[in-house]
Amino acid sequence: SYTRKSRKYSSYKGKVGTVAPNRIRRRFNTHIPHQKITTDTTEFKYYEVDEKGRMTMHKLYLDPFMDMCNGEILSYGIDKKPSAKNVMDALNETIEITADCPYRRTFHSDQGWAYQMKVYSHRLKEERIFQSMSRKGNCLDNSVMENFFGLLKQEIYYGVVYYSYEELKSEIERFIKYYNDCLLYTSDAADD
């Protein structure tokens, strides 16, 4: 759904499943890799020419999972529509990647419909992972991911028009690789 004022994508559909407590409570920092993970969904627009030669707008959705220890994007899904499969595939990959954590993990999100799904919360329970959710309508509760989205869109999206799904998808994937390989390394070196 969309809010009239900003037209920003909102995955909130009301209470459609499990709403978990906010376990993170803006305590984003951890020195333990793979202990605190955050996720969210963001939307991008691109254009294609239809069979009648008209320019039509389409959307692409990105579902990344980020390690709060170092900001690394551990896994992500990209699709033409918001989909449970996209979120679950990225979730399962992240669960596998973070299985080496010696402490109980916490996966944080907003209250979007995908994170309220029974299959999502059941998968976390299966792995003894705490589920945490931001308070309704409070983007500051997931500011780590919101900051990443802001950086991503500033670097590759604002002021640029994409003319195909593949072009936009490829640019997002290139940026995530660059972000993980170069930007995080640079920021880690600055902290030393």
Regions found by a protein language model. Give the residues of each.
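Residue-level detector of anion-binding/catalytic polar loops
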Residues: 130
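Active-site beta-loop-alpha junctions of metal-dependent nucleic acid enzymes
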Residues: 58-59, 76-100
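Short, surface-exposed connector motifs at secondary-structure boundaries
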Residues: 72, 100-105
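Conserved small/polar residues in nucleotide/adenosyl-binding loops
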Residues: 185-192
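Basic, flexible linker segments flanking DNA-binding modules
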Residues: 1-33, 138
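RNase H-like two-metal-ion nuclease catalytic core shared by retroviral integrases
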Residues: 10-15, 109-111, 117-118, 133-153, ...
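An active-site-proximal beta-strand-loop segment
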Residues: 26-74
